[in-house]
Structure formats: C-alpha cells, structure tokens
C-alpha cells in the first residue's frame, strides 16, 4: 500500500503466543495498524482512483504483480481491509466482497459455467437464485438440474462430466431443510466438481465449512454481518481447491461485472463483524426459546426450527453447525387468511423481507419472495400459503411471544 506518513509504516500489532479466539480476532486487525494516524477503525476511502509513484508501479498494479489499488471498481483499501478481516476468521485462501449476496452467487457460478454445462442444485432454493439460473444463465446454454438433495442417489445420478458445480443452501428458506454437506461433497468431488454452499443462514464463524467438504461459500453479508440492516453486501469465501475462482474473479469478473462492494458498506460491515458472535448467540438463543413456546400454541399447526429436538434435521444441524440452529424459524397456521391476519396484527415484530436484522421480522413467503411463481410451482417447492417466516432479532423473547399471541387472539 502507499505510505501516507511514516508513523511506524503500519507497524504490526503484538500477537499472542497462542491463536486468538474468533471473538477477539473479529475486533483486531492482526496484521497492521489500519491507519497512519492510529485510528481504531479503518477509514472509508471514498475515491475512484489512486495515484502511483511511477509508470512501472502502475503497470505492476494493473498486471497483479503488486497488490496496490488502481481503481475502485476492482480494489479499495476499505474493502480490502474487510476482506482480510473475514479471511482471518476462516481458513480461506481468498475472500472477495461484492455489492450484494446475489452478485456473489452470480460471480461464483460464472467461474464455472459455460454453454453445454449444467448446475446441479436443490429443488428448494431461494427464488432469485432460481431466476438467476433459469432466466439469466439458461439462455446462455447452461442447464439447471433441480433435485431433492436429501436423496443422495438422485444427486449422484444428476452429476455427470458436464456438471459445472453442485450448488446448495445449507438451510433452505423457508423450507428449513438441512443439506448433508459431507455426503454431497463426496458425490461432487468424485467427479472433480466443486461444492458451492450459500451459508447465509448460519454465520461462517460458527462452523468449519471447509472441513465438511465445501469448496466455496457465498454469503449475503447484508444479513447477520451488517448489524442492523445498514448496508448491502455479499462474500465469496474461497478455500483454494478450485483455482479458477480466484483467477476469474480477480482478473476478469471484478473488472467486467462491476459488482465490487462499496467502501461505505465495507466500513459498516467491518464494524458489524466485531459484534457478530455476541449478536448471533443472543438471536439464536431467543429463536430456540420462542420456537419451544410456540409449540404449545393450539392455533399454530407447525413450528419448523432445526434447533428443536423433534425436528427431522436436528441431529444433522447440531453436528454440522456446532450445536446452533440460527435465528430463522417458520410457523404454519390453519390457512392463508389466518397467516395474513397474524402478520397484519403484529406490533413488535416488523413486516419486512430482510433476515437477521437487530429487529425481528415477519414475512409471508408465498405472496412475497415466491410471488413470481405459480401456485403449482410453489407447492412443488414446498412453499405453502399457511407459512409465516420469522427472523428473530435482539428483542426479549417474552415480548416476541406476547406479540404473536396477541396477534392470534385479537
């Protein structure tokens, strides 16, 4: 990086003899002072271009010989700081930050697909990801093969020599199905196919995706990381097993697609990382207690939360995600009218489409994030009119429970 002043030239911080815990790493830079003046937060570099010392210096930057920023569409010190902070919390070889989760998904798929190739994925997938695969990549000659990922035999039959990647969500939204990552990785890797996982619903700090066979994670950092829904963002966490992710992203797609994270978003999300662990533990604990209480409400026909011991995915979820199940759950009422009525009467829980805000949120998936699909398509995806999705925030569980009860009984 260019020297701003000679204040220790970003002197390294003192490191502990043992590896620090993730909660500490999330608040420490671990590699240098972030600012020439000793600021405790990385400054926001709101500029489009960066000056070079010589013409050769400029050439070396543009050809990748030195890691200095040349243009904010592909590199910015504030964003690089955020990427390095995320990398320090994982075993990743590379981390790339984008301006949304969907941009991260599109980028990682474009690292592998081309005409004649196919993507093997779940028949339970986020609506915009489905649209990306069918409506954007489909006309370019890329086939999408949707299978039940719980049926490992079906997955094995779907993967062939033309498969570009296996793509999944670790917990489907809103079906709450949990993918067996290790089993799916074995199937994919037998054909030298990468396993790409959208891990938005469980923070990457809570489990070791690489140890389970995941080759790259995509994350909507808009969710848990942004801390209060303050900024859009997405991440690719690349474990280096398929070099084309780094090569194509760094030297092609960032230049050509214009999907790089903004400096302000990187600043906000670096700050969000510092409190991620504490917020997640509180939100997931509240989600579990609320789910337990709602099981006793007669008007609620089903509570779907993988942290409940009677959930069919409980053991797999606990094994993969370190005895945690996240802050999203769904409830089913008698019919659509009852579900809509409950949502309309909520006073504490907000009607909004985001996930993992500091505030709790309620959504009717069938009429919102899956509204573009026909009734028969939604039923095939197990998205039902009776379902309400709840994203649990930092409110007290007593207030959330009372809000739902009052909405049912009023």
Model-found features: residue ranges?
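PLP-dependent enzyme catalytic core of the Aspartate aminotransferase-like
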Residues: 7-10, 15-19, 134, 140-143, ...
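Conserved C-terminal alpha-helix-loop-beta "cap" of PLP-dependent enzymes
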Residues: 302-388, 392
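Glycine-rich beta-alpha junction loops
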Residues: 31-33, 46-52, 223, 275, ...
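Short Gly/aromatic-enriched secondary-structure transition segments
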Residues: 59-65, 346, 404-407
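Short conserved active-site loop signatures built around small residues
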Residues: 20-45, 236
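Conserved PLP-enzyme active-site core in the AAT-like
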Residues: 26-33, 94-299, 304
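Conserved N-terminal alpha-helix of the aminotransferase class I/II PLP-enzyme fold
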Residues: 49, 54-103, 128, 132-135
């Amino acid at each position: 990086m260019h020297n701003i002043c000679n204040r220790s030239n970003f002197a390294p911080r003192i490191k502990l003899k043992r590896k620090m815990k993730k909660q500490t790493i999330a608040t420490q830079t671990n590699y240098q002072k972030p600012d020439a003046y000793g600021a405790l937060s990385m400054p926001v570099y709101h500029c489009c271009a960066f000056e070079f010392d010589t013409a050769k210096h400029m050439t070396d930057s543009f050809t990748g010989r030195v890691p200095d920023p040349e243009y904010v569409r592909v590199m910015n010190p504030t964003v690089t700081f955020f990427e390095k902070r995320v990398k320090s919390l994982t075993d990743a070889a590379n981390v790339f930050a984008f301006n949304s989760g969907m941009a991260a998904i599109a980028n990682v798929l474009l690292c592998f697909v081309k005409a004649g190739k196919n993507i093997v994925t779940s028949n339970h997938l986020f609506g915009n990801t489905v649209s990306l695969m069918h409506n954007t990549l489909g006309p370019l000659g890329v086939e999408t093969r949707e299978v039940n990922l719980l049926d490992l035999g079906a997955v094995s039959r779907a993967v062939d020599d033309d498969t570009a990647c296996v793509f999944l969500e670790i917990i489907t939204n809103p079906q709450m199905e949990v993918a067996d990552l290790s089993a799916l990785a074995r199937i994919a890797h037998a054909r030298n196919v990468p396993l790409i996982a959208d891990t938005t619903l469980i923070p990457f700090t809570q489990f070791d995706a690489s140890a389970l066979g995941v080759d790259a994670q995509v994350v909507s950092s808009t969710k848990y990381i942004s801390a209060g829904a303050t900024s859009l963002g997405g991440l690719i966490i690349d474990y280096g097993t398929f070099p084309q992710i780094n090569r194509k992203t760094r030297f092609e797609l960032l230049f050509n697609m214009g999907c790089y994270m903004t400096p302000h978003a990187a600043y906000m999300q670096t700050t969000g990382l510092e409190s991620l662990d504490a917020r997640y533990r509180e939100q997931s604990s509240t989600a579990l207690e609320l789910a337990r209480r709602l099981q006793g409400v007669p008007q609620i026909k089903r509570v779907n939360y993988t942290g409940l011991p009677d959930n069919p995915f409980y053991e797999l979820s606990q094994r993969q995600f370190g005895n945690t199940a996240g802050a999203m759950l769904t409830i089913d009422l008698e019919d659509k009218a009852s579900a809509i009525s409950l949502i309309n009467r909520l006073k504490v829980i907000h009607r909004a489409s985001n996930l993992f805000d500091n505030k709790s949120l309620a959504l009717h998936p069938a009429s919102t994030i899956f509204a573009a699909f026909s009734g028969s398509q939604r039923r095939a995806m197990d998205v039902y009119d009776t379902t309400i999705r709840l994203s649990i925030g930092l409110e007290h569980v007593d207030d959330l429970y009372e809000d739902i009860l009052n909405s049912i009984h009023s």
